[in-house]
């Protein structure tokens, strides 16, 4: 009888353990599905700790080798014959002096004296009334946040596109930070907030396509920045102009411990010329919910023969504005779409998009409100 009781106790414990682990795993899977962005951040933080530990071990090993090498000093300033010192020396970048004289007939330089580098990023909430009052003193800002320098010819005319839904507390912080920085960089710019209405899952990529089309109707732009509203640059030398290749500006996010999550990461803030964006047929429209659209954009860029450039060193650091909203649910169909990126590139994008926007021009930005639905971007079989 006592043996039977012990067996029952063991059986009950096993059952309770099974129920506990089943409940725990189910809760974890549900959390990953409904809040994939947060779950992904936590996962990468754990991975980043491992990466940092391995890098520290490598650094210690390298310092020991330098110390024991007769031809090397501890700080690495003297190198063994034939060694490539470019791995150790950082090339300095010269910026123009304070007394530099601008010319309204010449292009604005890219390395201006007012670009100091590190920015003190303040993510404290501020009201739109305060922001409007602050920038009302700048009479050069036209409706829609359109600004251009007067002391030189802007090297780039930049349309900043911001996909948006229910982040009203972020917009004032964003403008408070970005407007002065872009003015320092002597770029011509304006802001377009593309707001998704309705009940469909958030479609960041389709919003960018809508914003691009409307911005092209509004003015003559040659550079487009695709910018998440909760990402703030920490360095004003991160120049928001475009180049011969597409640019990934947000290479080091604080929420990822300032480490690039993976080589093909193209999220947060990116920039393409108008010609480049049209050549790749824009973003895909088929990604509803969280994840995948940036990876598809990376594929499109490479299929079109481009490479992606990134800022050097700490220039690509960004701070994320904290938010209290539940993130979008995970888009489980993204893996199939990514598998057929090449086949879909020229049948899903700028060329198959239908929409009806409502446009409101604010003092600091143009608001493009649109109710997105899958039938607005029909896709042929591939």
UniProtKB/Swiss-Prot annotation:
Entry binding sites for Mn(2+): 230, 323
Transmembrane parts of this sequence: 15-35
Enzyme class: transferase
UniProt pathway annotation: Protein modification; protein glycosylation; Sphingolipid metabolism
Known catalytic reactions: a beta-D-glucosyl-(1<->1')-N-acylsphing-4-enine + UDP-alpha-D-galactose = a beta-D-Gal-(1->4)-beta-D-Glc-(1<->1)-Cer(d18:1(4E)) + UDP + H(+)
Annotated disulfide bonds: 108-152, 223-242
UniProt KW keywords: Calcium, Disulfide bond, Glycoprotein, Glycosyltransferase, Golgi apparatus, Lipid biosynthesis, Lipid metabolism, Magnesium, Manganese, Membrane, Metal-binding, Signal-anchor, Sphingolipid metabolism, Transferase, Transmembrane, Transmembrane helix
Tissue: High expression in brain and adrenal gland, lower in liver, lung, colon and peripheral white blood cells.
Glycosylated residue positions: 71, 75, 83-84, 99, 122, 307, 367
Cofactor(s) the record lists: Mn(2+); Mg(2+)
Single annotated GO MF: galactosyltransferase activity
Record topological domains on the Cytoplasmic side: 1-14
General function of this protein: Catalyzes the synthesis of lactosylceramide (LacCer) via the transfer of galactose from UDP-galactose to glucosylceramide (GlcCer). LacCer is the starting point in the biosynthesis of all gangliosides (membrane-bound glycosphingolipids) which play pivotal roles in the CNS including neuronal maturation and axonal and myelin formation.
Protein name: Beta-1,4-galactosyltransferase 6
Species this chain originates from: Homo sapiens
Primary gene name: B4GALT6
């Amino acid at each position: 009888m006592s043996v039977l009781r012990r067996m029952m106790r063991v059986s009950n414990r096993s059952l309770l353990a099974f129920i506990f682990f089943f409940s725990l795993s189910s809760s974890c899977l549900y959390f990953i599905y409904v809040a994939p962005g947060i779950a992904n951040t936590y996962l990468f933080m754990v991975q980043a700790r491992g990466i940092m530990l391995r890098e520290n071990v490598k650094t210690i090993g390298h310092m020991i080798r330098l110390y024991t090498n007769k031809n090397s000093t501890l700080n690495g300033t003297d190198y063994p014959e034939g060694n490539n010192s470019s791995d150790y020396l950082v090339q300095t970048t010269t910026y123009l002096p304070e007394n530099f004289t601008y010319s309204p007939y010449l292009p604005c330089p890219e390395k201006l004296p007012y670009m100091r580098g590190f920015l003190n990023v303040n993510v404290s909430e501020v009201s739109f009334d305060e922001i409007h009052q602050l920038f009302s003193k700048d009479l050069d800002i036209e409706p829609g946040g359109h600004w251009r320098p007067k002391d030189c010819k802007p090297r780039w005319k930049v349309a900043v596109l911001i996909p948006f839904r229910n982040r009203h507390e972020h917009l004032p912080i964003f403008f408070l930070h970005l407007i002065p920085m872009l003015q320092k960089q002597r770029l011509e710019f304006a802001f377009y907030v593309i707001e998704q209405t309705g009940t469909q899952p958030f479609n960041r990529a389709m919003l960018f396509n809508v914003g691009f089309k409307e911005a092209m109707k509004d003015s003559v732009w040659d550079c487009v920045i695709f910018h998440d509203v909760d990402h703030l640059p920490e360095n004003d030398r991160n120049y928001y102009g475009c180049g011969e290749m597409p640019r990934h500006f947000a290479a080091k996010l604080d929420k990822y411990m300032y480490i690039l999550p993976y080589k093909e990461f193209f999220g947060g803030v990116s920039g393409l010329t108008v010609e480049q964006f049209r050549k790749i047929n824009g973003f895909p429209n088929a990604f509803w919910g969280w994840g995948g659209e940036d990876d598809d954009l990376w594929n499109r860029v490479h299929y079109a023969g481009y490479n992606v450039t990134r800022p050097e060193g700490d220039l690509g650091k960004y701070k994320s504005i904290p938010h209290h909203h539940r993130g979008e649910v995970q888009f489980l169909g993204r893996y199939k779409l990514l598998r057929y990126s090449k086949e879909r590139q020229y049948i899903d994008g700028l060329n198959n998009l239908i929409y009806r926007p409502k446009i409101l021009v604010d003092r600091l930005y143009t608001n493009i409100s649109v109710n997105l639905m899958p039938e607005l971007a029909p896709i042929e079989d591939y």
